[in-house]
Amino acid sequence: GKDESEWTCVFHGSTLSKKERTIMLTGDSGSGKSSLSTILMGNNFSLIADDFSPMSISGNHYNFPSAISIKQGFYKPASKLFNDFVNLKQYFISETKGNVKYLPPDNKNEMVLNTHCDKVFSVKFGKNLSNEIKEVNKGIALNKILPDAWISNNMEHVKNFINWVKETTFYDLTYNDNEKIVKMINKII
């Protein structure tokens, strides 16, 4: 294990990998981030971390295995991607969140313990939104992800974080069609 001095930051995001290419999905609660993670897992991506994505001083994102919480509105698409989804126990969270099921990381895909992530997507799902991925200015992207991130105040970690930002491409991603957005992501990675 690593001790606190080895962690540069923790993001509020989901990190996934496919064929040694790694992406992170960020977005507000209810933005479709967990749904897109589930869709990508059903399309040969390995889940590295969901909702809590730690990055070490070496710039690698580490496996933080936890189940993805799937809201009731996404049960039908999730059950098409994962045969045993219907058998998962349902939990009532609150009046606002409603019922959820917890989908564990898919063991048919390769388990990735740590990897370098150089593409970050700010996700937004909406039935009236177009399927679009566009590169965005790093400053604008950081304004979205930093409020929910923890960054070490150690100067070496801060420098490593800045270097990671310089090497990383940030995107805004909107979608309404699962198959189309998977194809678009696969082209970018």
What feature does the model see in each segment?
Residues 31-32:
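Conserved glycine(s) of the Walker
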Residues 36-37:
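Post-Walker A alpha-helix
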Residues 1-20:
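Extreme N-terminal, non-catalytic leader segments
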